[in-house]
C-alpha cells in the first residue's frame, strides 16, 4: 500500500443540467495513500442515490456511508465498476449500512441504470479493454467509475503489459475526451486533484511518456528513475515500481 500523509478528503461538485428539473449531484470520496488514493462517487438527485465503487477498507466504506446519510437520499444501488479489490472490498461494510440496497454487479442487465430517472450509461465495454469500462452521465456530462484515469499519481501499468493494450487505453481516453465532459472522476487521484478533463489529459501524457521511456531504458530501475524525473510531484510507490518491473519482464503479474 502507498504510505503517504495525505488525509482522506471528500470533494463535492454540483453541475446544473438544462434538461433536468433537479440536476444530479456528484460527491467524491478520495481515500488516502493507504487505500491507494482510490475514489468512490456518490451520485444523487432529488430522492435517489447511487454509490459507484465501495472503497478499499472498512473505514473508507463507513465514510462513504456517511456521505449517503448526509445526502438524505435513498440509496438505490451500490455499483462496483471494476474487478480490483480497492473498488469492492468496502462493499460488505457499506451494504451493512443500507441492507435493502442491491449491489451491482451480481450482473448488470443492459448498459444503463438510472438515478431519479436520469441515465447512467455503461461505456467502454467493447474491444481489448472491455473489462475496464467507465460510466457516462449525459445529463451532467460526467465520467465516473473508471480505472483508466489517474490524477497526479504514477499510473498503474502492471495490468497493461503490451503496446497494444496501452494503445487501446489511449484510444479509450480519446473516446472519453471526445464527450467533452465537465466532470471526470479519476479512479485514483492525489488529494486536491481537479475532477475535470485535465485528468484524462494527464493520464494520456503519462502513458505516452511511459512508452517512450520504456523503449529507451534497459532495466526497471532505469525506467523508474526516468518516470520519477518526468513526474517529480507524483508520490512514489507500488504503482510505478511494480509497473516498471512487470513491463521490463523482471516480475510476473
Residue ranges of each PLM-predicted region?
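Gram-negative bacterial Sec-dependent N-terminal signal peptides
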Residues: 1-19
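Conserved beta-strand hairpin/beta-sheet module of binuclear metal-dependent hydrolase folds
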Residues: 21-75, 134-137, 141-147
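Active-site metal-binding motif and surrounding structural segment of the metallo-beta-lactamase
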Residues: 59-97
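Accessory terminal helices/loops
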Residues: 178-183, 191-253
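Soluble non-cytosolic domains of exported or imported proteins
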Residues: 37, 55-62, 85, 107, ...
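Metallo-beta-lactamase
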Residues: 56-57, 96-201, 205-209
